[in-house]
Each structure stands twice: as structure tokens, then as C-alpha cells.
């Protein structure tokens, strides 16, 4: 993932594959990777190759001191169309954060100001050593009510917390599920 050749990616995705459009997620994960697992600059470069077929998502850790400015930079300078949030991301002693933490609200408000509506949250299968409780979908409920102008997309439909996701999505018109990874579970082994 970190060293994908752009030519290979575009050929596999759009020439050999059946995709019409792809979402490029930024995956910060700075405590594990010096420049992030997938950084927004790399995604911005790839989008230049196929702007009509690639939708770039930025990524910011809300615990960063300059997080609001970084959201603005990624939108205005790099062309990010939404954000992918990793609530289980480590940062120093912190082992994650919650989408309903008031420290995140200024980032949502900056996105609204910039006209960016789509907030993706990694709420799927947890891998070691990340904490399972930081992938809990229930923290989406409050901000989706407070910010009805934003779309809260629960990536991987909250697996393995599908019941909680369904209850929240059923009553919140701005909560959606992304089936990435989840589709693999429809096939029998």
C-alpha cells in the first residue's frame, strides 16, 4: 500500500478492473509510519493523473495542535474532497479518540466552512495492537445530530458492531455505511 506504483494502480483499478470511480483514503498513522501510511500529498499527486475518477480523502489527527489549519491546508492546497478519520490512531501515550469528543468539533466546523461534507470513519475490524473500543460506532451518534449538514460515513459498516451501526443509521438521515471490506463476508469459504 505504501509504495504502490501509480501506473499499476490506475491500470488495475480502471482498465483491468470494473471500477468507474475510486475513493483514495489518507491513513495518517504517524506513530507507526514516519510520513503516514498513506499521506495526503501522495493521494493529491495520484488524483492529478485521473481527476474525474479519483476522490481524495484527507486525514488529520484531531489531537495535533494545528489540526484545524491542517484540515484547511489539505482542502485548499491538496484538493481533498472529504476526510477519513482513524479514531483508534495512536499519538504518544494516547491510544485513540472519539468522534464525539468536543476537541473534534472545530474540525467538523472547518469542514462545513470549506464546503466539505463527507466524513469517513474507520469503524471496522481492529488489528493488533489497536484498541477495539476505539472502533466503536456509537460515538458517531452525537456529532451526526449536532452537524446535520455533514455526512457521517461509517467505513466497513462498523464490523463487528453491525447492530449498533444499524440502529444509528436507521434514525440518522446523514449516517451512511461503506461496504469496503464487509463485502468479503458475503462469500462462503
Regions found by a protein language model. Name each.
Residues 1-189:
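Helix-coil boundary/capping segments in enzymes
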Amino acid at each position: 500500500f505504501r509504495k504502490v506504483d501509480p501506473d499499476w494502480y490506475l491500470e488495475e483499478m480502471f482498465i483491468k478492473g470494473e471500477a468507474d470511480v475510486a475513493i483514495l483514503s489518507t491513513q495518517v498513522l504517524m506513530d507507526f509510519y514516519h510520513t503516514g501510511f498513506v499521506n495526503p500529498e501522495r493521494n493529491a499527486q495520484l488524483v492529478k493523473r485521473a481527476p474525474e475518477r479519483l476522490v481524495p480523502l484527507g486525514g488529520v489527527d484531531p489531537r495535533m495542535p494545528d489540526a484545524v489549519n491542517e484540515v484547511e491546508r489539505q482542502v485548499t492546497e491538496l484538493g481533498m474532497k472529504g476526510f477519513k478519520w482513524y479514531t483508534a490512531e495512536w499519538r504518544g501515550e494516547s491510544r485513540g479518540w472519539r468522534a464525539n469528543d468536543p476537541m473534534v468539533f472545530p474540525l467538523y466546523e472547518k469542514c462545513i466552512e470549506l464546503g466539505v461534507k463527507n466524513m469517513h470513519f474507520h469503524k471496522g475490524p481492529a488489528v493488533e495492537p489497536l484498541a477495539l473500543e476505539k472502533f466503536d460506532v456509537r460515538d458517531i451518534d452525537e456529532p451526526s445530530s449536532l452537524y446535520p449538514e455533514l455526512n457521517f460515513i461509517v467505513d466497513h459498516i462498523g464490523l463487528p458492531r453491525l447492530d449498533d451501526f444499524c440502529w444509528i443509521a436507521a434514525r440518522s438521515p446523514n449516517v451512511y455505511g461503506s461496504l469496503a471490506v464487509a463485502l468479503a463476508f458475503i462469500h462462503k469459504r
